[in-house]
UniProtKB/Swiss-Prot annotation:
This is tRNA pseudouridine synthase B. The keyword tRNA processing applies. The keyword Isomerase applies. One of its GO terms (molecular function) is tRNA pseudouridine(55) synthase activity. It holds the Pfam family TruB_N. Gene3D superfamilies: Pseudouridine synthase. It comes from the Bacteria. The active site is at residue 39. InterPro entries: PsdUridine_synth_cat_dom_sf, PsdUridine_synth_N, tRNA_psdUridine_synth_TruB, TruB_C.
């Protein structure tokens, strides 16, 4: 039985659920979950939670992500990426656009921006996923959503090929950002139909691509009983939360039993959520929140045994 977080390199062609399914067979355990869907055609780091670490998956998903994305100007598609049918084309050559113009437009997308999620996505409208409407050739109004782009900049030269223009960007963003929609919107700002032609996630929830393991590597490590050495502790997935050190053994016992407390037990005023940590082992004991109906009280959200 494993308890911890494992950064997995998801290969192209696999769904996030495929990764979980394969790991359940290899590790012979059911309590495994991923931390946010990566589309099949996207590769990169996918943090996987094992055992008790599944309790912190929501918090890992809230952390930032970084991508390398190839943007192609000159063609738009039904899915906003390279897998869709072509919607519109417009020839692009060196006289139409330059690197300075592209860089100036990219800067306009930093900060909080509005996005309309793509039709081929799992966003729900009226109880149905958008891709269900798309597959039935139905139209539906898609609500705008605010997302956060911490940084976006170009990391390649601008190249021209077969009446299209290509350049790669690095994007650091918050939860819920659609990079293919970002690519399409960048194209619109530049005056051309566009789509995302390749995507790799290089960081997610504090985990880097360089430290990610392939499924084959995980299998080999498990068979040699050395996978434990590659696991990140549960605490790593909660590093963005305020923590309180607990020394008193009776207080520790009450926390582990899931008791509620008056806020005065805390050394300072907090907003939700926060964690109690065993001062001797530095292991997280529980995640607590302010009681929604009793603002003077704190209650457990997740307890770790």
């Amino acid at each position: 039985m494993y308890n911890g977080i494992l950064p997995v390199f998801k290969e192209r062609g696999l769904t996030s659920h495929d990764v979980v399914f394969k790991l359940r067979k290899i590790l012979k355990m059911k309590k495994i979950g991923h931390t946010g869907t990566l589309d099949p055609e996207v590769n990169g780091v996918l943090p996987i939670c094992l055992g008790d670490a599944t309790k912190v998956s929501d918090y890992i998903m809230e952390m930032g992500k970084t991508y390398h994305a190839m943007i192609t100007l000159g063609k738009s598609t039904t899915t906003e990426d390279q897998t869709g049918d072509i919607l519109e084309t417009r020839a692009v050559d060196k006289n139409d656009i330059n690197e300075d113009t592209i860089d100036q437009v990219l800067q306009q997308f930093e900060g909080h921006i509005q996005q309309i999620p793509p039709m081929y996505s799992s966003v729900k409208v009226n109880g149905r996923k958008l891709y269900e409407y798309a597959r039935n050739n139905e139209t539906v109004e898609r609500p705008k959503r605010q997302v956060f782009i911490k940084d976006i900049h170009r990391i390649s030269e601008v190249t021209f090929q077969e009446q299209t223009c290509h350049f790669e960007v690095e994007v650091t963003c918050g939860k819920g950002t659609y990079i293919r929609t970002l690519a399409t919107d960048i194209g619109l700002k530049l005056g051309f139909p566009a789509h995302m032609s390749r995507l790799t996630r290089i960081a997610s929830g504090g985990f880097q691509l360089e430290s990610s393991l392939t499924i084959d590597q995980i299998k080999e490590l498990h068979e040699h009983d050395s996978l434990h050495n590659e696991l990140f502790p549960i605490e790593y997935g909660l590093k963005g939360l305020k923590s309180f050190q607990v020394k008193d053994s009776n207080f520790k016992k009450k926390i582990c039993n899931g008791q509620k407390f008056h806020k005065k037990v805390l050394s300072q005023n907090v907003k939700e959520p926060f964690i109690f940590v065993d001062s001797s082992t530095q292991k997280v004991l529980a995640i607590y929140i302010v009681h929604p109906d009793k603002p003077y009280e704190i209650k457990p959200k997740k307890v770790f045994n």
